[in-house]
Protein backbone atom coordinates (compact mmCIF):
# COMPACT_ATOMS: atom_id res chain seq x y z
CA UNK A 1 0.00 0.00 0.00
CA UNK A 2 1.19 3.51 -0.82
CA UNK A 3 -1.21 6.31 -0.05
CA UNK A 4 -1.96 9.84 -1.13
CA UNK A 5 0.62 11.25 1.26
CA UNK A 6 3.43 9.72 -0.85
CA UNK A 7 5.48 8.94 2.23
CA UNK A 8 6.36 5.36 1.34
CA UNK A 9 5.22 1.75 1.16
CA UNK A 10 3.52 -0.30 3.86
CA UNK A 11 3.58 -4.06 3.33
CA UNK A 12 1.48 -6.09 5.75
CA UNK A 13 1.33 -9.85 6.18
CA UNK A 14 -2.32 -10.58 6.90
CA UNK A 15 -3.79 -13.82 8.20
CA UNK A 16 -7.46 -13.98 7.24
CA UNK A 17 -9.89 -16.48 8.69
CA UNK A 18 -12.82 -18.17 6.94
CA UNK A 19 -15.23 -15.42 7.98
CA UNK A 20 -12.88 -12.57 7.09
CA UNK A 21 -11.40 -12.02 10.54
CA UNK A 22 -8.04 -10.37 9.88
CA UNK A 23 -4.83 -10.22 11.91
CA UNK A 24 -1.57 -8.46 11.07
CA UNK A 25 1.15 -11.10 11.43
CA UNK A 26 4.05 -8.85 10.44
CA UNK A 27 4.82 -5.70 8.47
CA UNK A 28 7.56 -3.61 6.90
CA UNK A 29 7.46 0.07 5.98
CA UNK A 30 9.87 1.47 3.41
CA UNK A 31 10.32 5.13 2.45
CA UNK A 32 10.13 6.00 -1.23
CA UNK A 33 13.43 6.57 -2.97
CA UNK A 34 13.57 10.32 -3.79
CA UNK A 35 13.51 9.67 -7.56
CA UNK A 36 10.37 7.53 -7.34
CA UNK A 37 8.60 9.94 -5.02
CA UNK A 38 9.42 12.81 -7.39
CA UNK A 39 8.14 10.85 -10.41
CA UNK A 40 4.88 9.94 -8.67
CA UNK A 41 4.39 13.47 -7.35
CA UNK A 42 4.91 15.00 -10.81
CA UNK A 43 2.28 12.68 -12.26
CA UNK A 44 -0.32 14.28 -9.99
CA UNK A 45 -0.50 17.20 -12.44
CA UNK A 46 -0.72 17.19 -16.26
CA UNK A 47 2.62 17.48 -18.01
CA UNK A 48 4.67 16.60 -21.06
CA UNK A 49 5.29 12.96 -22.04
CA UNK A 50 2.79 11.92 -19.40
CA UNK A 51 1.91 8.45 -20.71
CA UNK A 52 5.55 7.36 -20.92
CA UNK A 53 6.32 8.75 -17.46
CA UNK A 54 3.27 7.01 -16.01
CA UNK A 55 4.29 3.63 -17.39
CA UNK A 56 7.86 4.07 -16.20
CA UNK A 57 6.68 5.07 -12.72
CA UNK A 58 4.28 2.10 -12.65
CA UNK A 59 7.18 -0.23 -13.36
CA UNK A 60 9.39 1.44 -10.75
CA UNK A 61 6.61 1.23 -8.18
CA UNK A 62 6.07 -2.47 -8.94
CA UNK A 63 9.77 -3.09 -8.36
CA UNK A 64 9.62 -1.17 -5.07
CA UNK A 65 6.54 -3.15 -4.00
CA UNK A 66 8.35 -6.39 -4.92
CA UNK A 67 11.30 -5.37 -2.75
CA UNK A 68 8.92 -4.68 0.16
CA UNK A 69 7.26 -8.08 -0.31
CA UNK A 70 10.62 -9.87 -0.36
CA UNK A 71 11.76 -8.06 2.78
CA UNK A 72 8.49 -8.95 4.50
CA UNK A 73 8.84 -12.62 3.52
CA UNK A 74 12.42 -12.72 4.78
CA UNK A 75 11.44 -11.06 8.05
CA UNK A 76 8.58 -13.53 8.51
CA UNK A 77 10.66 -16.55 7.39
CA UNK A 78 8.11 -17.41 4.71
CA UNK A 79 8.28 -18.38 1.04
CA UNK A 80 6.30 -16.93 -1.85
CA UNK A 81 4.40 -20.23 -2.02
CA UNK A 82 3.04 -19.56 1.48
CA UNK A 83 1.16 -16.46 0.27
CA UNK A 84 -2.30 -16.72 -1.30
CA UNK A 85 -2.19 -13.33 -3.02
CA UNK A 86 -0.92 -9.78 -2.90
CA UNK A 87 -3.51 -7.02 -2.75
CA UNK A 88 -1.73 -4.10 -4.45
CA UNK A 89 -3.43 -0.73 -4.58
CA UNK A 90 -0.90 1.25 -6.60
CA UNK A 91 -0.48 5.02 -6.44
CA UNK A 92 -3.51 7.16 -7.24
CA UNK A 93 -2.50 9.89 -9.69
CA UNK A 94 -5.97 10.77 -11.01
CA UNK A 95 -9.42 10.40 -9.51
CA UNK A 96 -12.29 11.88 -11.54
CA UNK A 97 -15.57 10.29 -10.40
CA UNK A 98 -17.68 13.30 -11.38
CA UNK A 99 -17.54 12.71 -15.16
CA UNK A 100 -20.60 10.48 -15.47
CA UNK A 101 -20.11 7.59 -17.90
CA UNK A 102 -16.62 8.93 -18.64
CA UNK A 103 -15.59 8.88 -14.97
CA UNK A 104 -12.25 7.25 -14.24
CA UNK A 105 -9.65 6.63 -11.60
CA UNK A 106 -6.03 5.73 -12.24
CA UNK A 107 -3.66 3.99 -9.85
CA UNK A 108 -0.16 3.80 -11.31
CA UNK A 109 1.26 0.28 -11.02
CA UNK A 110 2.34 -2.63 -13.23
CA UNK A 111 0.74 -5.57 -11.38
CA UNK A 112 2.04 -8.05 -13.97
CA UNK A 113 5.61 -7.01 -13.19
CA UNK A 114 4.92 -7.30 -9.46
CA UNK A 115 3.56 -10.82 -9.97
CA UNK A 116 6.55 -11.78 -12.11
CA UNK A 117 9.10 -10.46 -9.61
CA UNK A 118 7.47 -12.10 -6.57
CA UNK A 119 5.97 -15.28 -8.00
CA UNK A 120 2.71 -14.46 -6.21
CA UNK A 121 -0.78 -13.84 -7.60
CA UNK A 122 -1.50 -10.09 -7.61
CA UNK A 123 -4.95 -8.54 -7.25
CA UNK A 124 -5.10 -4.88 -8.23
CA UNK A 125 -7.30 -2.16 -9.80
CA UNK A 126 -9.76 -2.20 -6.91
CA UNK A 127 -11.68 0.94 -7.85
CA UNK A 128 -12.54 0.85 -11.56
CA UNK A 129 -15.48 -1.56 -11.42
CA UNK A 130 -17.19 0.55 -8.77
CA UNK A 131 -16.89 3.62 -11.00
CA UNK A 132 -18.23 1.61 -13.93
CA UNK A 133 -21.29 0.87 -11.79
CA UNK A 134 -21.82 4.58 -11.18
CA UNK A 135 -19.97 4.87 -7.88
CA UNK A 136 -17.06 6.99 -6.72
CA UNK A 137 -14.66 4.07 -6.33
CA UNK A 138 -13.86 5.42 -2.88
CA UNK A 139 -13.64 5.06 -0.01
CA UNK A 140 -13.21 1.28 -0.10
CA UNK A 141 -12.02 0.66 3.46
CA UNK A 142 -15.43 0.98 5.24
CA UNK A 143 -16.32 -2.64 4.42
CA UNK A 144 -13.14 -3.75 6.19
CA UNK A 145 -13.77 -1.35 9.07
CA UNK A 146 -17.20 -2.92 9.52
CA UNK A 147 -15.56 -6.37 9.61
CA UNK A 148 -12.96 -5.37 12.18
CA UNK A 149 -14.51 -2.71 14.40
CA UNK A 150 -18.28 -3.28 14.63
CA UNK A 151 -19.54 -2.77 18.17
CA UNK A 152 -22.61 -2.74 20.36
CA UNK A 153 -22.34 1.06 20.50
CA UNK A 154 -22.35 3.71 17.79
CA UNK A 155 -18.78 4.18 16.64
CA UNK A 156 -16.96 5.83 13.76
CA UNK A 157 -13.56 5.24 12.20
CA UNK A 158 -11.55 8.25 11.04
CA UNK A 159 -8.80 7.25 8.63
CA UNK A 160 -6.25 10.06 8.51
CA UNK A 161 -4.14 9.33 5.48
CA UNK A 162 -3.43 11.94 2.85
CA UNK A 163 -7.20 12.28 2.63
CA UNK A 164 -9.45 11.92 5.67
CA UNK A 165 -12.37 9.54 5.41
CA UNK A 166 -15.04 8.47 7.85
CA UNK A 167 -16.71 5.11 8.33
CA UNK A 168 -19.93 5.27 10.34
CA UNK A 169 -20.78 2.08 12.22
CA UNK A 170 -24.08 2.47 14.07
CA UNK A 171 -24.87 -0.30 16.54
CA UNK A 172 -28.14 -0.91 14.71
CA UNK A 173 -28.08 0.38 11.17
CA UNK A 174 -26.40 0.42 7.80
CA UNK A 175 -22.68 1.02 7.44
CA UNK A 176 -21.87 4.25 5.62
CA UNK A 177 -18.80 6.30 4.90
CA UNK A 178 -17.27 9.02 2.77
CA UNK A 179 -14.22 11.19 2.26
CA UNK A 180 -14.50 14.27 4.45
CA UNK A 181 -11.55 16.38 3.28
CA UNK A 182 -7.78 16.68 3.55
CA UNK A 183 -6.05 14.55 6.14
CA UNK A 184 -2.28 14.98 6.03
CA UNK A 185 -1.98 15.96 2.38
CA UNK A 186 -1.84 19.75 2.75
CA UNK A 187 0.26 19.72 5.92
CA UNK A 188 2.73 17.37 4.20
CA UNK A 189 2.85 19.53 1.08
CA UNK A 190 3.37 22.75 3.06
CA UNK A 191 6.20 21.44 5.23
CA UNK A 192 7.89 19.79 2.23
CA UNK A 193 7.71 23.05 0.29
CA UNK A 194 9.24 25.13 3.08
CA UNK A 195 11.38 22.73 5.13
CA UNK A 196 12.03 19.76 2.86
CA UNK A 197 10.48 17.32 5.35
CA UNK A 198 7.94 14.80 4.08
CA UNK A 199 5.70 15.21 7.14
CA UNK A 200 5.31 17.26 10.31
CA UNK A 201 6.40 14.84 13.03
CA UNK A 202 3.97 14.93 15.97
CA UNK A 203 2.62 18.20 14.54
CA UNK A 204 5.61 19.98 16.07
CA UNK A 205 5.79 22.73 13.44
CA UNK A 206 2.05 23.30 13.53
CA UNK A 207 2.28 23.61 17.31
CA UNK A 208 4.65 26.56 16.90
CA UNK A 209 2.06 28.52 14.92
CA UNK A 210 -1.28 30.15 15.63
CA UNK A 211 -4.66 29.49 14.09
CA UNK A 212 -5.66 32.08 11.48
CA UNK A 213 -9.45 32.02 11.75
CA UNK A 214 -9.99 34.08 8.59
CA UNK A 215 -7.84 31.68 6.58
CA UNK A 216 -9.60 28.66 8.10
CA UNK A 217 -12.99 30.04 7.08
CA UNK A 218 -11.66 30.66 3.58
CA UNK A 219 -10.41 27.08 3.30
CA UNK A 220 -13.68 25.66 4.64
CA UNK A 221 -15.61 27.65 2.02
CA UNK A 222 -14.53 25.13 -0.63
CA UNK A 223 -17.61 23.49 -2.14
CA UNK A 224 -16.41 19.97 -1.33
CA UNK A 225 -17.14 20.35 2.37
CA UNK A 226 -20.82 21.13 1.82
CA UNK A 227 -21.43 18.26 -0.63
CA UNK A 228 -23.62 15.44 0.59
CA UNK A 229 -22.29 11.86 0.57
CA UNK A 230 -21.50 9.73 -1.29
CA UNK A 231 -18.41 11.74 -2.08
CA UNK A 232 -14.70 11.21 -2.57
CA UNK A 233 -11.73 13.46 -3.12
CA UNK A 234 -7.98 13.38 -3.55
CA UNK A 235 -4.97 15.31 -4.72
CA UNK A 236 -7.02 16.46 -7.73
CA UNK A 237 -8.95 18.74 -5.34
CA UNK A 238 -6.58 19.47 -2.46
CA UNK A 239 -3.02 20.35 -3.45
CA UNK A 240 -0.40 23.03 -2.96
CA UNK A 241 -1.68 25.22 -5.80
CA UNK A 242 -5.19 25.13 -4.26
CA UNK A 243 -3.72 26.27 -0.94
CA UNK A 244 -1.62 29.01 -2.51
CA UNK A 245 -4.69 30.34 -4.31
CA UNK A 246 -6.52 30.50 -0.97
CA UNK A 247 -3.57 32.30 0.62
CA UNK A 248 -3.56 34.95 -2.11
CA UNK A 249 -1.01 37.71 -1.77
CA UNK A 250 -1.13 37.88 2.02
CA UNK A 251 2.17 37.21 3.79
CA UNK A 252 1.18 34.66 6.44
CA UNK A 253 3.80 33.31 8.86
CA UNK A 254 4.63 29.83 7.58
CA UNK A 255 4.00 28.12 10.91
CA UNK A 256 0.60 29.83 11.19
CA UNK A 257 -0.41 28.30 7.86
CA UNK A 258 0.65 24.87 9.15
CA UNK A 259 -1.32 25.39 12.36
CA UNK A 260 -4.38 26.42 10.35
CA UNK A 261 -4.08 23.34 8.13
CA UNK A 262 -4.03 21.21 11.28
CA UNK A 263 -7.27 22.91 12.34
CA UNK A 264 -8.73 22.38 8.86
CA UNK A 265 -8.30 18.61 9.15
CA UNK A 266 -9.68 18.47 12.69
CA UNK A 267 -12.60 20.84 12.02
CA UNK A 268 -13.73 19.27 8.74
CA UNK A 269 -13.54 15.75 10.19
CA UNK A 270 -15.50 16.57 13.35
CA UNK A 271 -18.04 18.71 11.53
CA UNK A 272 -18.75 15.91 9.04
CA UNK A 273 -19.09 13.37 11.84
CA UNK A 274 -21.44 15.60 13.84
CA UNK A 275 -23.58 16.31 10.78
CA UNK A 276 -23.99 12.70 9.64
CA UNK A 277 -23.67 10.69 12.87
CA UNK A 278 -24.35 12.98 15.86
CA UNK A 279 -25.09 9.95 18.07
CA UNK A 280 -21.51 8.62 17.74
CA UNK A 281 -20.07 7.62 21.10
CA UNK A 282 -16.54 6.59 20.11
CA UNK A 283 -14.24 7.78 17.34
CA UNK A 284 -11.35 5.45 16.46
CA UNK A 285 -8.53 7.13 14.53
CA UNK A 286 -6.20 5.25 12.20
CA UNK A 287 -3.75 6.10 9.43
CA UNK A 288 -0.57 8.14 9.64
CA UNK A 289 -2.41 11.06 11.22
CA UNK A 290 -3.04 8.94 14.31
CA UNK A 291 0.67 9.43 15.09
CA UNK A 292 0.32 13.23 14.93
CA UNK A 293 0.06 14.05 18.63
CA UNK A 294 -1.00 17.64 18.02
CA UNK A 295 -3.80 16.52 15.69
CA UNK A 296 -5.15 13.92 18.12
CA UNK A 297 -5.09 16.45 20.95
CA UNK A 298 -6.88 19.00 18.77
CA UNK A 299 -9.58 16.49 17.83
CA UNK A 300 -10.16 15.81 21.53
CA UNK A 301 -10.25 19.47 22.54
CA UNK A 302 -12.49 20.56 19.64
CA UNK A 303 -14.99 17.71 19.92
CA UNK A 304 -17.00 19.60 22.54
CA UNK A 305 -17.72 22.28 19.92
CA UNK A 306 -19.55 19.72 17.77
CA UNK A 307 -21.05 17.18 20.20
CA UNK A 308 -23.42 17.71 23.11
CA UNK A 309 -22.18 14.53 24.78
CA UNK A 310 -18.60 13.44 25.54
CA UNK A 311 -17.03 11.86 22.46
CA UNK A 312 -14.43 9.24 23.29
CA UNK A 313 -11.50 9.58 20.88
CA UNK A 314 -8.88 6.87 20.67
CA UNK A 315 -6.64 5.22 18.09
CA UNK A 316 -6.84 1.75 16.60
CA UNK A 317 -3.99 0.74 18.93
CA UNK A 318 -6.69 0.19 21.55
CA UNK A 319 -8.25 -2.40 19.20
CA UNK A 320 -4.91 -4.15 18.77
CA UNK A 321 -4.16 -2.77 15.30
CA UNK A 322 -1.28 -0.41 14.55
CA UNK A 323 -2.89 2.70 12.94
CA UNK A 324 -0.26 2.64 10.18
CA UNK A 325 -1.29 -0.89 9.15
CA UNK A 326 -5.07 -0.52 8.94
CA UNK A 327 -5.21 0.50 5.29
CA UNK A 328 -2.70 -2.14 4.22
CA UNK A 329 -4.75 -4.75 6.06
CA UNK A 330 -7.87 -3.42 4.35
CA UNK A 331 -6.48 -4.07 0.88
CA UNK A 332 -5.27 -7.53 1.90
CA UNK A 333 -8.84 -8.18 3.04
CA UNK A 334 -10.25 -6.77 -0.21
CA UNK A 335 -7.96 -9.13 -2.15
CA UNK A 336 -9.23 -12.02 -0.01
CA UNK A 337 -12.82 -10.94 -0.69
CA UNK A 338 -12.10 -10.96 -4.43
CA UNK A 339 -10.74 -14.50 -4.21
CA UNK A 340 -13.86 -15.51 -2.29
CA UNK A 341 -16.00 -13.92 -5.04
CA UNK A 342 -17.46 -11.70 -2.35
CA UNK A 343 -18.41 -8.12 -3.30
CA UNK A 344 -16.53 -5.82 -0.95
CA UNK A 345 -17.56 -2.36 -2.05
CA UNK A 346 -20.52 -0.89 -0.19
CA UNK A 347 -23.00 0.93 -2.47
CA UNK A 348 -24.19 3.00 0.51
CA UNK A 349 -20.62 4.30 0.77
CA UNK A 350 -19.47 4.67 -2.84
CA UNK A 351 -22.84 5.36 -4.47
CA UNK A 352 -22.59 2.53 -7.00
Residue ranges and their predicted role:
Residues 4, 8-22, 27-32, 176-266, ...:
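Conserved ATP-utilizing enzyme core subdomain
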Residues 6, 263, 314-352:
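Glycine-rich phosphate-binding/hydrolytic loop that grips phosphoryl groups
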Residues 97-105, 112, 116, 120-198:
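Phosphate-binding/catalytic loop of phosphoryl-transfer enzymes
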Amino acid sequence: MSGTSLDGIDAVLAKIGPNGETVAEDAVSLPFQPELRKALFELQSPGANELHRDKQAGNALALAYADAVKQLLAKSKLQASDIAAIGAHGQTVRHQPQLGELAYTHQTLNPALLAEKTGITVIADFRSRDLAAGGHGAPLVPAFHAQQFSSTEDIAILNLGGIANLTLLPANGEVSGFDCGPGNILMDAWIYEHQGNTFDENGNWASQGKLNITLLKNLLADSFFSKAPPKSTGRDDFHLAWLQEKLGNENHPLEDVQATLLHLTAHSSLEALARHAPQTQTLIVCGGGARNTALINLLKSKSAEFFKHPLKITTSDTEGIDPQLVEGLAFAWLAWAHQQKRPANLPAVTGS
